[in-house]
Amino acid sequence: RHEEYARLLKGHTTADQIVIIFSGCMASLIYKNVWGDDDTCPVFVESTIPPFSTRRVEPGKVRMFVRHLAPIAFFPASAADKYYDRIIADIYEFPGKFEDVLECGLSLVNPTVHPGPCLVNLSNIEKPDFTFFLYEHGFQPSGLKIDVLLNKERLRIGEAFGYKIHALEDFAGVDTIDSWEPMYAMGHGCHALTSIAGPNDINYRYLTEDIPIA
């Protein structure tokens, strides 16, 4: 999808424009590969999460559950010094910046939140007579233990690149995560999360995107 959109966008930008990609997952590298050395290549900015958690309620109506604030990364990384303050003033109050898009990509929180609870609840997700709520029904010890292991692997990868990743820890509001309890407490203690229904289909992004990325 990123490559398809980048090809549509190429030819309609200038070098002093900024393209912001929410939930970028290192999409800047894909965009740059499409532009190559073209002198119309804009500056790319990535965030780890979308600005809002939303769900479509009905045609033409969307419910917003929570507003997100997360740091951003620039590509090239050197553009941060020039453009960060401008983005804060003109667009959105992003609370800080990553060193580069690799650190940003490794800090995506969903790949260490959704996989475990989804994998151990596939039968409930597929039940036609049951509305599954991930943060209410899925945030149980068995699934969260998988997330803890995924996060430990992610932390080791980050350390190998010289990064101190703390995305899941920030999500849970703790300094370290050594067990499932902090995530359980955070999920069940946040109405903005427990009120989000789904997934109720195995072809949902929690499974088709977050699990492969993890």
Protein language model features and the residues they cover:
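Rossmann-like NAD(P)(H) cofactor-binding subdomain of soluble oxidoreductases
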Residues: 2-57
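Small-residue-rich helix-loop
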Residues: 143, 150-199, 203
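Conserved aromatic-histidine-acidic binding/catalytic patches
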Residues: 19, 23, 138-146, 206-210
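Internal, well-ordered alpha/beta segment that forms a basic, Gly-enriched binding/recognition surface
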Residues: 36-40, 46-95
